[in-house]
Amino acid sequence: MKHHAGLIGLLGLALTIFAYAMFQGGFVSWFLLYATLPFLMFAFIIYFYPVRKMTATRTFTEGELTRGQKLDVEIHIKRSDWWPLYYMKVTDQPPFPEETPKSRVVFIGFRREVVLNYSIDKLPRGAYEFNALELELVDLLGWLRKRWTISTPQQVVVYPRITELSYTPIASNYDQGAARARYQMHKENAVATGVREYQPGDRVSWIHWKSFAKSQTLRTKDFEDRQAQDTLVYLDLTESHSFDDAVDFTISVVQAMASSDTTGAFILPGTRGIYLPAITHQGHVERVKRELATVEPLEEKWMKRLVAEDKRLGTFKGIICITAELDKDRVEAMTHMTPQLREGLYFVVKTEASPKLTTAELAVVDYAQARGWSVVVLPPSQFTEAFLEVLKR
């Protein structure tokens, strides 16, 4: 409708100037008519210009995106003709929270391809969908504006940030002295629970020959690791300002566990959660990372209910619970569900802006310690020293 209004305005202007020249006569009136004709013709051409033939694509920063990283976006706009155009306004709406539309104005002239760039600092974790680009052509004097959109749906996934740290099993004082060696021996007699991609170092006896016969691709049997029942990494999903930092620390611990000489289990609670009885290779880490990229925090009451109903917790002797907020009810529920617990550790992750426990949380520390839980408070700057703090206790 706006396009039609612009066309009607142009026709009205052209008729007015022509009528003025016809009835007024003289050099001035006819000069005015001929002087405005090129601009009017250019505006009419803009109106009828086949904008649908233009194509647009986005390209993003290469490689895996992590929280806090900078994203560079490059927009390529192409057309098939050489018709001269004045300038075009390109608007893109990034899907990230609190991001305003990114607009650029570019002079086109005879160019058939235009490249525009913009950047987004400090990406938030999650999966996001870029939608349509909005383009706007304008004539020389701004009499006519032609807007349209080009559908360019693209998804980007921002993963949690991994910090390298040295993992120390909290259950090293019971049955973990030669965990890796016994894990290898256990595999020889354990029952396979699935198959995975072949990893360097896998034994010939672990190869899944039936799968190899069908696909001609080496795959390895995935075994249930009963030794891993000793230690569990559990992420508390209670909503908090430092929830994303807690997610970052969780994937860092899982990565360190997979790279160490010990094994452990992982539970991400909730209806869309996952349970890994053993974290033994990078494939497990990648699966956890994909899930943590899109995990959302829960209200406190729902998180308490998940803990109180999770019977899997009762099979573990050592538990590393990572939370962004220490709460008495959840500590009580966790204690009740872990009758075999010998070593319990709460990592309470805080932001750099507020690195200390609140008054309410300080009161819970004594309650947790009385029930066998150690409590370590961590801002992101101390992630690398997390398990050093555990050894000091």
Say what each PLM segment does.
Residues M1-T57:
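Extracellular/lumenal glycan-associated context and N-glycosylation machinery
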Residues Q255-R393:
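Acidic, glycine-rich A-domain
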Residues P38-Q282, G318-I322, T335-H336:
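An amphipathic, basic-hydrophobic helix/alpha-beta surface used to engage anionic
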